Amino acid sequence: MRSKLFLLSVILLICVSCRHKKAATDKETVTTENTYTNPLLEYGAEPWAIYHEGKYYYTQGSENKIILWETNDITDLSHATQKEVWIPNDPSNSYHLWAPEIHRIDNKWYIYFAADDGNMDNHHIYVIENVSANPLEGEFVMKGRIKTDKDDNWAIHASTFEHRGERYLIWCGWPKRRIEAETQCIYIAKMENPWTLSSDRVMISEPEYEWERQWISPDGSKTAYPIHVNEAPQFFESKNKDKVLIYYCASGSWTPYYCIGLLTADAGSDLTDAASWKKLDTPVFEQQPEDSVFGPGSPSFVPSPDGKEWYMLYHARRIPNDAPGATDSRSP
């Protein structure tokens, strides 16, 4: 796994769940000065961060609000400044605030998140905006819900990026409203502005391999119906910028089989053409039971302060899966 990531020029901040660990030798000196300890917080799913003018701004999923953390050190979140920046007051988007992401676009701050009215079948993507220089100051205001297709299908896990002068949105959505089973796929579209799409959605990945379609945990616990998952897409570029990379998560997040897959496209190709994308047939990051790391996923990437490395944030569990009704034990 590590070799795959390095071949793609990604230098990751990865915990003991790497498949190929290098043992220390007597010629190596290990100090605590530049080390970190996982997990970074006791609890928290769907971690996401951005680095801007010497500060990291971090956020994670919640049930009913959005919190931002501000810190000089992304590995020291427990001592970061925190602020609640969004508490919804519209019943249609006041529940299950999943996978918030903060982006700096045209000198304004935007947070993308999914929310619903209490019924998770009604999840949609929303965008809020803050014109202040610091996102912990000023006020976020609702820009609206992103309508992702003409049928207004279920949509979560939105992320945005700019490539060669064009802004794109990538997200997880349903091909159509579920009946007896559910399939979650990765979509892409061009954007007119940070809260409006300018092209039709195009599916670039669906769960096809066995490792993408796991929904039953080893202890037999499962959802009420089959759910096959591709979700949480994240943009990255190869070192020489000749490839566009989309990391995404596969299989049910409630299982230990949750993992990270990879899509690639040539940088000069039409990113809204499904034929431009190729999928690796094995995950690039997955559970490591011997180290008690299960279901790693929901990646995001931030640079080190000196710009020499890239860090990957992700969540995982220390147990295979949570018992029904138990507190979510995922942590970043």
Language-model features, listed with the residues they occupy:
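Bacterial Sec-dependent N-terminal signal peptides
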Residues: 1-28
